[in-house]
Each structure stands twice: as C-alpha cells, then as structure tokens.
C-alpha cells in the first residue's frame, strides 16, 4: 500500500529539527530511514532545494525554502507528484504560521512541535486519495516536476549511516561528499555585498578605460596595445572575483589569491596612466574582496541532533 509514513521540518543551516510527526513505526526498516533523515539533515545546506533519496522500500523526499527544509518518508510506490504536493502544503502552512525570525532564533530541537497537528491532518488527507482528488489541483505540480525533476541523491553522496549497513550502499571514493556544483556558501554579509559592488565598479572602470585605450590606439595617439590588454585583464579579474564571492568552486581561496595577484600586476603595469589614489583604490578593493571570499566559506556540517 502506498502511503506517507512521517514528516519533519528542519532548519537548513544547522540541521536543527523544528517539528516532526510523532506516529512513526518502530520497524527495522523505519529505524534505518530515521538514521538517513539524520544524515540528510546534516547535508541540507549542501544539497539542491528539491531532492529524493531512494532507500529500497522507502523514499525520502524534501524541499528547502527560506532556510527551512520539509522532509517526508513514504513508501517507494507513493506518487512523486503527491509527495511534493504534500511537502508544498507543509511549506505554505509553516511560512504562514511562523515568521523567519522565530525559525532563525530557535535554539531547542522541536520547539514548534505543535505544528505536528497540521502534519498529521495533511498526512491523513494525502493517504486517502479519494478525499484528496477533489480538493487539490496537481497539474501545476506535475508540470513543475517534469520541468525541474528532483535531484536524485545517491548513497555515495550521502555516505554510510553510523552502524547501519544497507543493500544499496556501494563502495566509492569520496562517499559523503557533495559535488561542488551543489555546495552552498554561508549567507552573504553586508561587507560581502559592499565588496561585490566595489569589484563590479572596478571592473566597469577598467572596461571603460580599455575602450578609451582602443579609441586612442585607432587615432594613433601612441597608446601601447599592452595597456588595452592590461585594462581588459583587470576587468576579467574583477568579474571573476565577483563570481568567486557568490559561487562555490574547487580551490576557491587559491583562485581568489591568484586573481588578486593579477589585479596587482595589471595596476603595476598601468601606473603611468593612473595616479596613486586610483592605484590605491583598485588594489585595496581587490584585497578587500579577496578577504571577503576567504571569510565566506561553504556551510559546515550540522550538529548531531537526534532527528
């Protein structure tokens, strides 16, 4: 029989469980799935906002939005469209009931356990398709899942549960590590946003001066072609610093220092065309953005909450 078995609401940044259904079974398979719940909660910050983990006879589905993740366990034959429609209802109700300040400042696990009442009512509706079919329209959800299907989490990415062996576990290098394409950075700070804007400004200034240098060269005013290259390299370096500030990539800190070195070299070559204040501004902004890239690291692992 296809059905929803349990659901949880978890804070993304640290895996703190905010609420959960309390009527789950105590079978061996269910207990193993609860351990997968715990492992997923530690990696939510590194995963896409819509995912599915298949664990044999059960599927774990979740969606994340505004720093909160909504996770559910169902049988493997439960329809995907109903599973994500169920999660969507939980999300809408939770956002309506609790503001972001409450969820961000919560310190105790299950501090919104009263939300379990809504989880239970919604779960009963979705486990009774006859009463459900006339009350919701699934066409939008079907279209959304077709256009943007949930990311399939492999056991390699999840790693092996502590003390748990699974027939679906496989040996692979780097198990438990999420690819950099799905890695998330810590929330941007005000200084990071300022650095991003200043780096864009420096890139724009370099680009404008580069076009002026091309114009001067065409008019045979004697500008060196190497100046044009230096201006455009400076533009590329500033834009790449913006990219590193926003997105996670391998060897990110090393790339940021190399990019800052390129900015310094370009400004050293352009010292005849810029005064000391201009040189100081460009180099200082480059150093500031490099610092912000170094400070804004990938979100770390969550504490070991018993989810």
Swiss-Prot record:
Signal peptide: none annotated. Keywords: Acetylation, Coiled coil, Endoplasmic reticulum, ER-Golgi transport, Membrane, Phosphoprotein, Protein transport, Transmembrane, Transmembrane helix, Transport. InterPro entries: Longin-like_dom_sf, Longin_dom, Sec22a/c. The modification N-acetylserine is found at residue 2. SUPFAM superfamilies: SNARE-like. Residues 8-119 form the Longin domain. Residues 2-187, 248-253, 296-307 are cytoplasmic. The modification Phosphoserine is found at residues 6, 8. The chain crosses the membrane at residues 188-208, 227-247, 254-271, 275-295. One of its GO terms (biological process) is endoplasmic reticulum to Golgi vesicle-mediated transport. The keyword Acetylation applies. One of its GO terms (cellular component) is endoplasmic reticulum membrane. It is found in: Endoplasmic reticulum membrane. The keyword Heme does not apply. It is a multi-pass membrane protein. Residues 209-226, 272-274 are lumenal. Belongs to the synaptobrevin family. May be involved in vesicle transport between the ER and the Golgi complex. This is Vesicle-trafficking protein SEC22a. It comes from Macaca fascicularis (Crab-eating macaque). The gene is SEC22A.
